[in-house]
From Swiss-Prot:
Catalytic reaction annotation: (3R)-hydroxybutanoate pentamer + H2O = (3R)-hydroxybutanoate tetramer + (R)-3-hydroxybutanoate + H(+); (3R)-hydroxybutanoate tetramer + H2O = (3R)-hydroxybutanoate trimer + (R)-3-hydroxybutanoate + H(+); (3R)-hydroxybutanoate trimer + H2O = (3R)-hydroxybutanoate dimer + (R)-3-hydroxybutanoate + H(+); (3R)-hydroxybutanoate dimer + H2O = 2 (R)-3-hydroxybutanoate + H(+)
Induction and repression of expression: Seems to be expressed constitutively both in the N-rich medium (cell growth conditions) and in the MSF medium (PHB accumulation conditions).
GO cellular component terms listed in the entry, alphabetical order: cytoplasm; membrane
Listed EC numbers: 3.1.1.-
Main location: cytoplasm
Name under which the protein is recorded: 3-hydroxybutyrate-oligomer hydrolase
Pfam families associated with the record: Abhydrolase_6
Keyword vocabulary terms for this entry: Cytoplasm, Hydrolase
Loss of function: phenotype: Deletion of this gene enhances the deposition of PHB in the logarithmic phase in nutrient-rich medium.
Enzyme class: hydrolase
Function comment: Catalyzes the degradation of various 3-hydroxybutyrate (3HB) oligomers at a high specific activity and artificial amorphous poly(3-hydroxybutyrate) (PHB) at a lower specific activity. Hydrolyzes the 3HB pentamer most efficiently than the tetramer, trimer and dimer. Does not hydrolyze native PHB granules and semicrystalline PHB. Participates in the mobilization of PHB along with other hydrolases.
Chain's gene name: phaZc
Amino acid sequence: MSASPRLGFVQCISPAGLHRMAYHEWGDPANPRVLVCAHGLTRTGRDFDTVASALCGDYRVVCPDVAGRGRSEWLADANGYVVPQYVSDMVTLIARLNVEKVDWFGTSMGGLIGMGLAGLPKSPVRKLLLNDVGPKLAPSAVERIGAYLGLPVRFKTFEEGLAYLQTISASFGRHTPEQWRELNAAILKPVQGTDGLEWGLHYDPQLAVPFRKSTPEAIAAGEAALWRSFEAIEGPVLVVRGAQSDLLLRETVAEMVARGKHVSSVEVPDVGHAPTFVDPAQIAIAPQFFTGA
């Protein structure tokens, strides 16, 4: 069992060329039981440090930094920052891991990637945990996220950056100062400013390009495609919803349970979008679903 993750890289392809995707790996590298944990839109694979540490006795846990984030390379063409490209990258990652099946833990965008992959014929996804995300996303929450996505923010100190991240992550719920630091330390990176070293965000600001190009027609078509993928999923699905979530509405969860094949749900109290799975009660949800423990 690893006390800390191993960092690996895999070469992926897009229409604009090759790019390296980083992944953080926990547990026995020979373990055939693999859990892939995929993060949210502006986050990194290090979001899963706590839950990966808890599960790596049973699983080889692999937490990628999706293209344009964290230790991964930025795409040459910002129009590639879309779910189909991310699904393609994950197929490459799973091939690198040399396994036929994986379980999937996807938070927000990571859940959309998981749905896209799990809904394919002959999918490698065995079980799918969707953390506060579904085929239908509340427009007001998407607008809230879009308001800060890609802004050229800079901070004079690391602590100033942490304070900003805590503010925009308030919907994560209550955390101790130590937990906030652990969650957000990887989101900041040192950058050269006009007056010396400053701190910026880890991700490519061009992530906002396809996000801001979206039209009502494109959003409707995307939602319909996600429902088709979701309804095609053959394996068990657990939908985890933050009770105060503004992104995944309670009625959407009910619709997912009704329209999916093997779908169950659980609601996490006192949390919005999205549960961070650093609290023991939240962490316990994952092994109960994946292993029955």
